[in-house]
Structure formats: structure tokens, C-alpha cells
Amino acid sequence: MNKSIAHIVLCTMLFSQVEYNHPELNWHTFDTEHFKIHYHDETEKTAREAATVAEAIYPKITSFYGFEPYQKTHLVLLDPDDYSNGAAYYYDNKIMIWASPLDFELRGSHRWLQNVITHEFAHIVSLQKSMKAGTRIPGAYLQSMNYEEEKRPDVLYGYPNTLISYPVPGTCVPPWLAEGIAQYMYDDADWDTWDSHRDMILRDRVINNNMLTFNEMNTFGKKGIGNESTYNSGFALSTYIANEYGSAALSDIMGELSSPLQFSINKAIFNVIGRSGDDIYLDFKNSIEAKYNTLVNPIKVMPVQGTRLQSEGTTNIHPKWHPSGRSYAYLSNKGNDYFGQTSLYFHDIAAGEDKKVKSGVFSAPTWHPNGELIY
């Protein structure tokens, strides 16, 4: 006799910690009206500035989305490593900020704390608003199991022959929207802006007929500048929606995604705006293609082509001339897939040869005046 069991298993998400532990740090905590600020001795000054920034942007973000976290948000300021980033753990209601300003080749210059705290808190608020079952239930599995009819007398069931498992996510927000609205922040925000770096990346995709499709914008894990293109495309599309249909549409879409049976961004946009996500994307695509082609057409009349010095790899950055002027050092990810997998190379112009100096170099090189040392 076949026996079938259907059940729901509530799942918890376990994230591995990739950063090193630092037991030598002496941690402190203080409270503001809406945040718990955590810092170690070396980041006290940054933490106090961060507290001021966080309270200043709190009403702007929460009023924009019409949502407030259920309790004080944890804001952790740390600076133990030669690293910079920000992260929002929206189920934990926690933000981690590395104190050192981020110097990223694909972004322009922005005020670090104001930018990163607003960006990450926008994640906290917008993604918590989109949750289907709150922060305590991140998801579920619908499962069904069947067993062989034959079984041992001392065993309750036969050997399992069927296992069907269907995940039901508690949050269903595509990356382009999550990152797009976090960069948009709120109306008239100027901590993060559409800078020339972002414009260059999107413009290059448009004029070379290489725009990310609506589906391609829904994932990370791309090579080269593909992941950054998800950020840029999401920022541009979110801004387009806000300009064409009102910025309240962004908040309303997040609210629509919180509906228990709403798992489609295409349908969620349709329910809010009255047009499908595919149609909105097509309008957006046509709009920016017309814009960039109009700007580029005059340049095409008398094009000026430079000489390509390096063609291998998707990242070739920070070239520095040798004091002699006959060679240069640069960073490249040749042989690797991702933008940040760079190594230091030395190129001899006369010989036309490259030499790898050191793997895993991420900052711009500098020559000693004698030309014998490089930092």
C-alpha cells in the first residue's frame, strides 16, 4: 500500500560568514531613536556620524515606502580589514557598514556614509515591506513523499521512491528592482546619483545592441561588468517608472509583491500600473535607445579610433607609465571571469610582451621614481 505524506516544512536560511573573525576588537553599543549602533574602538567617530546620518534619512525612507521596521534596526560599523562594502540583512533587521569609503572603478564619487547607509536602509525597508510572512518566516517547502509497498515488519514505511519538494519564497523581489530602488532611494535624494560611470556602462550596451533583457536583469552571477549592469539597468528602469508613473509606483509594487500568491514581477507591475513589466521594459528600452543614438550619431560622422593596447580580459584598468616611458604596469583579469579578479601586469612596449608580476592585486600601482620598484 502506497502512503503519501504532504507537509509544510518551515525553513530558516543559514548564511556562512566569509569574513574573518576578529576577537581582538572591543565592541560598544548605543541607541538612537530608531537604531542600535554597534562599533569597535577604532570606529567610534564613524559610528557617531553614522548615527546622525541614519536618523536624518529614516523619515525620508519610511515615508517614501509607507513602512517602518518592527523594531530598531541594528547598524554595525566595522573596519578590521582592507575592505569596503555595505550589506543589508533584511530578515535580521541588520546593516553592516565598513568604515573605509568604497573606491569602485565602475562608480563615481559619492559621500560614503550618506550613500551607503541610505542605500542599505532602503533595502531594509523596501524588502521588509515586500515580505509575505514577516521576518520570522523566510520561506516554506511544500513536500510530498511516497514509499514502496514492500517493507520490513519492524519498519513503519517501505523504501522511499518519490520526493517532491516545491519551495515557496517569503520574499520575491528581482535583483534589478531591489538594487534599482535602493539607488533611487527616495524623491530628490542626491546621495547616490546617475553619474558618468553608470551612464557609460548603460550607453555602451545600448549603442552596441547588448542591453540586458528583462529576464537577464533578474539575476546576478554574470561575467565582467554584467553584475554592475544589473545595478545600472535596475537604477535606470526604476527611475523611468518613477518619472513616467509617479514614484509611489515603486512603493506600491513592493506592497503588491507582499501578497501571499504574488510571485511574478510582471504581474505585480501590471496590477499596480496597468501595464505588464514586459511592456514597461519595452517602452524603457525604446526610450533610452532613442536618447543615446541621438547623442552618438554626430560622433559617428567623423569617428576617431584609438589604438587598443590590451584586448584580453574584461578588466584592464589603472595603467601607469614606467618613468622611462617605454613600458607600463596595469591591472587585468585576463584568464578570469569576474571584474574584481585582477592581477598586476608589466607590459614592455618594444618587445610587445606582458609579464604577470603578482596575482590578486586590486589597487592602482605606483612606480618609484627610479623605475625599479612598484607599489
Residue ranges of predicted features:
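A flexible loop/linker signature enriched in serine peptidases of the S9 family
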Residues: D192-D195, S311-N316, L331-L344, K358-F362
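Bacterial Sec-dependent N-terminal signal peptides
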Residues: M1-P23
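Residue-level recognition of alpha-helix boundary/capping or hinge positions
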Residues: F15-N21, T29-D31, F35-H38, P59, ...
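Surface-exposed helix-capping loop/turn segments at secondary-structure junctions
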Residues: S63-Y70, N243, S247-L250, T307-R308
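Acidic/His/Gly-enriched intrinsically disordered linker/tail segments
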Residues: H22-P23, D92-K94, W112-V116, I124, ...
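Juxtacatalytic substrate-recognition/specificity segment
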Residues: Q17-V168
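Conserved beta-propeller blade repeats
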Residues: R107, Q114, G313-Y328, E353-I374
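Multi-bladed beta-propeller domains
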Residues: K291-T315, Y345-S363
